[in-house]
Amino acid sequence: MSGYEVNFDGLVGLTHHYAGLSFGNEASTQHQNSVSNPKLAAKQGLLKMKALADLGFQQGVLPPQERPHVPMLRKLGFSGSDESVLAQAMQQSPRLLSALSSASCMWTANAATVSPSADSADGKVHFTAANLNNKFHRAIEAETTSGVLRAMFNDPRHFAHHEALPQVALFGDEGAANHNRLGGDYGKRSVQMFVYGRQEFGGEIAPTRYPARQTREAGEAIARLHQLDEQHTVFVQQNPEVIDQGVFHNDVIAVSNQNVLFHHQQAFYRQQQALDEVRRKMATLDSELVAIEVPTTRVSVADAVATYLFNSQILTKPNGKMMIVVPEESRQHSGVWSYLSEMVASGGPIDEIKVFDLRESMRNGGGPACLRLRVALNEQELRAVNPRVMMNDSLFITLNEWVDRYYRDRLTQNDLADPQLLREGREALDSLTTILGLGSVYPFQQ
């Protein structure tokens, strides 16, 4: 196989808590005000990273961001010492403090959209940090995300970085969670599929209950920035009816790997027409789409959302067959598990299931696919990645010790005003940037 898919998982931050901040994400809303366990959340994520690295997959780590985000609190009128800022925010607007303490950057599928060098006219890997315009607690992530990505992929001969799109609804961009790449080997030109929820200019249909976070206009802008060939680029609208049922990103209803698209029967608007265009464009690259469509009669949209069946990872094994990585919730649901078991026994491309317990992330609405950013790289590009962010035995031990030293095993919203939590977080992140060799990427380090 030419090239590699490298998954960069987000390390859960110290302020991981359940605040119900994400309207349209039903798991997030349902678990509002529950007590969280940041230490367990971080360790569950690390176990997934290490298990996949041990199986021979290329696996990296993306660090959490500084939270509470004191600079934004100051911008919004809170003043005095950092301790005073936190106390004022808790007294006057605890919901605002909660939003500015969110650990949502753990879901690195929303960190950026990435286009491999094989698809870009200049032969470079392109990164555009997502503006995450639809949710305030996420829109503040883009600047630090850009800095972290530049520190990890810092060789301009191989990597091109773009700032997030303008911070307005017209260009609402949720990153790789609404982006699929379909083709053959990772190192060869493929078709990029940008999925959107609404089209600002000339759109026909949009959801009515929950917001469509991604626009077609955002996808088109990223395709231009990344110098993609329109002959191998597809823009597909997600079915607005499933957005209104809690499918807030496309990776909650579909997932791809190489030439395989695993998706629900109701995933896309005018689905047959959309997939026909993907097939035609893949055919020009001598690649054939394998669409695995799950019928509503087997798995309802509600069950897909509850179990995160499609918020899974599909990984290509050395023998060419594929493995699907699902959360424990998929195994606990008899109908979903029955479907998965039949699928892997059917002789198709996916012949193995791997299950992970990601309960802390799942209760906030993020499964295996949410936690990772896919980056397809060739041999030279992989060598140019900052090696200290790549998972191995040594890094796994170091990061677990780091979590043990700094993380709490119980956190509620009231704890967010604790100045000691802020100090713990800054000390932890200062140490982490040394471990991962990132330099000064956080506001408090500037």
From Swiss-Prot:
Its Enzyme Commission number(s) read 3.5.3.23
Taxonomic superkingdom: Bacteria
Under catalytic activity, the entry for this protein gives: N(2)-succinyl-L-arginine + 2 H2O + 2 H(+) = N(2)-succinyl-L-ornithine + 2 NH4(+) + CO2
The UniProt entry's GO biological process terms, in alphabetical order, are: arginine catabolic process to glutamate; arginine catabolic process to succinate
Q: Which GO terms describe its molecular function?
A: N-succinylarginine dihydrolase activity
**Pfam families per the record?**
AstB
Query: What keywords tag this UniProt record?
Result: Arginine metabolism, Hydrolase
Enzymatic class: hydrolase
Q: Where does substrate bind?
A: 19-28, 110, 137-138, 213, 251, 364
Pathway assigned to this chain's UniProt record: Amino-acid degradation; L-arginine degradation via AST pathway; L-glutamate and succinate from L-arginine: step 2/5
Enumerate the active-site residues. E174, H249, C370
Name the family: Belongs to the succinylarginine dihydrolase family.
Biological role: Catalyzes the hydrolysis of N(2)-succinylarginine into N(2)-succinylornithine, ammonia and CO(2).
Subunit record text: Homodimer.
Q: What is this protein called?
A: N-succinylarginine dihydrolase
> Which organism is the protein's source?
Serratia proteamaculans (strain 568)
Q: What is the lineage of its organism?
A: Bacteria, Pseudomonadati, Pseudomonadota, Gammaproteobacteria, Enterobacterales
